[in-house]
Amino acid sequence: MSACTSFLRVAGDKVNLSFSSNSWRTTSEEKRYDERMANEDPEKTYQSIRRAAEVHRQVRQHARRHIRPGMTMTEIANNIEDGTRALVEEDGLLSGVGFPTGLSLNNCAAHYTPNAGDTTVLQKGDVLKVDIGVHVKGRIADSAFTLTWEPTYNKLLEAVKAATDTGIRESGIDARLGEIAGAIQETMESYEVEVNGTVYPVKPIENLSGHSINPYQIHGGKSILLVKNDDQTKMEEGEYFAIETFGSTGRGRIVESGEVSHYARRMDAPHVPLRLTSAKTLLKSINKNFGTLPFCRRYLDRAGESKYLLALNHLVGQGIVQDYPPLCDQRGSMTAQFEHTILLRPTVKEVVTRGDDY
């Protein structure tokens, strides 16, 4: 892909907000909003997220055309990330890849990207989740889609896309997170998938969630589960959310499984003396290249780091870096994901990553 300096020809969907009986907000919520707005010019952050989202649309358009069975996971990841870096005009911590490209296959739903030496090849029968992040000045456009090359799992993809669209529709200023989750669950569970003569209900993955997004922090603290719950927390004006849903033909519950590839420096990392010189050196590199943005082992390789696993595991053990293992449902099941980033402006819900594709 060639570099592009004009990113703002599309700005996603805008939906006018209607205010419900939940429209009264507590003093503490108003105070938090005032504090957020005091620290940033909204119009500038809007332009940053829109630029990131436009790059996302262009990168994924290319990816959807070119990803094919027979490619390695490393080829796919490099193509997406190199395209992102070129289009967003990567500039240190000012703009670049928002997080490692997720390429989770089949029963694995999230947090897989290839490490160096991974020779996994995409197969025709695979269900591939493609989760791409782009950031401009720390504002992360987080959006994902699922690809399949056989019609067997089309209904699974349809269910998850519909559930994500439901989550977006139900979101807005003062919407309660538990109620959004209930609507997502209801939509998802209205679908079923037939595989080799056996009918499977589509289940929302109960221990995965959408999330708020803060500057340079992909998981901002608020979570939108995919099953109904009693969370009375409200969405607030000025917030960004990744509305994402995952559906499964399996148990509808994931566990950590497989080799870790995803990491991030913790926002609340303790100040602890590091006894390993290699850990101190690696932490300096992480701070310089990623800050609190998620990264993977391939990104450390690209930054010139080598023989770093002992140091990296030490940083994890000290609570300075968080590791994120792959998240998988039972073997033999299939999972799908769709996701968009939304921005809650005072009178408009802007689906910044919306495109012609999804």
Swiss-Prot record:
Source taxon at top rank: Eukaryota
Keyword Membrane carried by entry: no
EC number, as in UniProt: 3.4.11.18
Amino-acid positions noted as binding substrate in the UniProt annotation, renumbered to this chain: 111, 219
Binding site for a divalent metal cation 1: 131, 142, 339
Catalytic activity: Release of N-terminal amino acids, preferentially methionine, from peptides and arylamides
Name of the protein described by the UniProt record: Methionine aminopeptidase 2
Cofactor binding note: Binds 2 divalent metal cations per subunit. Has a high-affinity and a low affinity metal-binding site. The true nature of the physiological cofactor is under debate. The enzyme is active with cobalt, zinc, manganese or divalent iron ions. Most likely, methionine aminopeptidases function as mononuclear Fe(2+)-metalloproteases under physiological conditions, and the catalytically relevant metal-binding site has been assigned to the histidine-containing high-affinity site.
UniProt family annotation: Belongs to the peptidase M24A family. Methionine aminopeptidase eukaryotic type 2 subfamily.
GO BP terms, alphabetized: proteolysis
Molecular function as annotated in GO: initiator methionyl aminopeptidase activity; metal ion binding; metalloaminopeptidase activity
Co-factor(s): Co(2+); Zn(2+); Mn(2+); Fe(2+)
Lineage, broadest ranks: Eukaryota, Fungi, Dikarya, Basidiomycota, Agaricomycotina
One annotated Gene Ontology cellular component of this protein: cytoplasm
Alphabetized PANTHER family for the sequence: METHIONINE AMINOPEPTIDASE 2
HAMAP family in alphabetical order: MetAP_2_euk
InterPro entries reported in the protein's UniProt record: Creatinase/aminopeptidase-like, Met_Aminopeptidase_Type2, Pept_M24, Pept_M24_MAP, Pept_M24A_MAP2, WH-like_DNA-bd_sf, WH_DNA-bd_sf
Function noted in UniProt: Cotranslationally removes the N-terminal methionine from nascent proteins. The N-terminal methionine is often cleaved when the second residue in the primary sequence is small and uncharged (Met-Ala-, Cys, Gly, Pro, Ser, Thr, or Val).
Annotated residues for binding of a divalent metal cation 2: 142, 211, 244, 339
Localisation: Cytoplasm
UniProt keyword annotations, A-Z: Aminopeptidase, Cytoplasm, Hydrolase, Metal-binding, Protease
